[in-house]
């Protein structure tokens, strides 16, 4: 069983955990907080009303340019979405490797 009580996932953890959780029927969503999409990654733009529409228990992985901004805002995200899991993408958009796969 995956530990979902962590603050950050690396890109490889995100990709592996996304696959494992989706096999269990859990939605894992990459959330763009900077209006700057990651090339080759499927993500939604941060929009609280839209995010709240996801099923309870969904996992949101928030990213910014460096990962520091979303990491520092985790308390805010978790209070806004108490029925969802909120995690920050370590290194953010800057550390994303387009060709990385697991």
Q: Which positions does each model-derived feature cover?
A:
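Conserved beta-strand segments of alpha/beta enzyme cores
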Residues: 29, 40-42, 85-87
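Active-site regions of enzymes building and remodeling cell-envelope glycoconjugates
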Residues: 38-48, 57-60
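Active-site neighborhoods of enzymes that stabilize oxyanions during catalysis
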Residues: 100-102
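Short amphipathic alpha-helix with an adjacent loop that forms part of the alpha/beta core around
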Residues: 17-21, 47-56
């Amino acid at each position: 069983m995956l530990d979902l009580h962590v603050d950050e996932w690396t890109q490889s953890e995100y990709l592996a955990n996304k696959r494992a959780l989706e096999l269990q029927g859990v939605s894992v969503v990459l959330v763009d907080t900077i209006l700057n999409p990651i090339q080759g990654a499927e993500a939604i733009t941060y929009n609280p009303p839209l995010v709240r529409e996801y099923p309870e228990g969904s996992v949101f992985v928030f990213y910014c340019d460096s990962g520091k901004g979303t990491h520092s805002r985790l308390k805010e995200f978790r209070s806004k979405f108490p029925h969802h899991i909120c995690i920050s993408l370590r290194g953010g958009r800057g550390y994303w490797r387009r060709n990385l796969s697991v």
